[in-house]
Amino acid sequence: MILIKLGGSIITNKEKPLSARRKAIDSILNQIKRIREPMILVHGGGSYGHYWSVKYDMHTKPAKYDMRGVSIVKNSMIDLNKIILNSAVKNRINAYCLPPTDFMNGNKPIKNKILTINEIAKSGLTPVTYGDALWFGKKKSYILSGDVIMTMIGKILKPRLSIFVLDVDGVYSNTKSKKLIRDFKKEKPIISKNKIDVTGGMTRKITEATNMSKSGLKVFFVNGNKPKRILDAVSGKKFEGTIFRS
């Protein structure tokens, strides 16, 4: 099974609120449809969910955030998810929408529900889930990052490969010279943060990918602007990107 995260930075224009990169989405899914094994797709919020999260000062830590903000973030994520689903169906991927409320209780994953996602993937459908604003309990809520969903699903289902599709080639040891780290285990990068991204941007992705690799999972970062690299990673060909492994 292959677990794939479509980063918010590649599926939306993060500098322009509520704008999807529809051509990029179509190109990526046109490559993903060629994968001949069960898949699970996760996508980020980009300029949809993150835009409203910042506006309403919502974060990944459960707290008493404005419930109007929760509602607006959820609605915006449904809008973005619909764009992904429409592109998937157009590309003959049998997309099966699974909001995170289907497998989360508070901020903890429900193991048997995640095991069911695997069965759905094996049936010929492709589960599609996403980062979202979730009710935590009483008057508390929080932002669940798509990167955290990757770790949750990865640790329970143990996919053959987990791929983060980004708008850059991978992790750079130096962001100015764009020197690519091909094997993360051998080198540690300097990470610059993007102020708009409440779920942690590249820092969060690296943390989650490292956690996944410590569980024995193989994780790749690839550039979605060159979507054939996704297939190269899946097929085991030499590809441009960053690998995380134990």
Predicted regions and their residues:
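C-terminal catalytic "cap/lid" subdomain
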Residues: I2-S246
